[in-house]
Amino acid sequence: MINKAILGGTFDPIHNAHINVAYEALERFNLEEVIFIPAGNPPHKIKLKKTPAHIRYEMVKLAIEKETRFSISDFEIKSKDLSYTYRTLKHFKEKEPETNWYFITGEDCLSYLEHWKYIDEIFNICNFVIFSREGFKGKEEIIKKKKSMLLKYGKEILFMDASILDISSTKIRNRIKEGKEVSFYMPDKVYKFILQNNLYK
């Protein structure tokens, strides 16, 4: 069976930690492909100001262009509807029903996972991969807490201790506003694109 993963995010901007997570997932779960999906209108970030979708899409495209096992989808940014995870996963599952799908997300999502829209359908579509920084505490407690939910859907939450740097898109945006160096946080082409388009100032 073919294994593929979806890695969604606002990617505002995409940075090296996103890339590292994708590479570690490729190796850990024997994936044929990781699909990066820039968020369109995520319901939990409606009120937050975001860089236009086509610009975020272009940055992701530049960041992953040399890796043949990475691809990008404009599924969410083409839609005017809210970007619910269920809708996105359903789209890809219907396109490739025989593929074993993984959904990669951060440890911060665990605390409210059961409140996601259509969470029961989501568990039927994919395997959850939670990436956490090395030394993340509370993993055992969370697994215990979610045990009944996992038994109900017959799926397990897979943890991946990603060797990621202390980087966040928010940190990068703030450093740019403050006139600080950020080139070492992202692929060179993304950095040049940000400079050329005078972003985040």
UniProtKB/Swiss-Prot annotation:
Catalysed transformations (reactions): nicotinate beta-D-ribonucleotide + ATP + H(+) = deamido-NAD(+) + diphosphate
Top-level taxon of the source organism: Bacteria
GO biological process, one term: NAD biosynthetic process
Enzyme Commission code: 2.7.7.18
Keywords (A to Z) from UniProt: ATP-binding, NAD, Nucleotide-binding, Nucleotidyltransferase, Pyridine nucleotide biosynthesis, Transferase
Similarity comment: family membership: Belongs to the NadD family.
Job of this protein: Catalyzes the reversible adenylation of nicotinate mononucleotide (NaMN) to nicotinic acid adenine dinucleotide (NaAD).
Record's protein name: Probable nicotinate-nucleotide adenylyltransferase
Gene of this entry: nadD
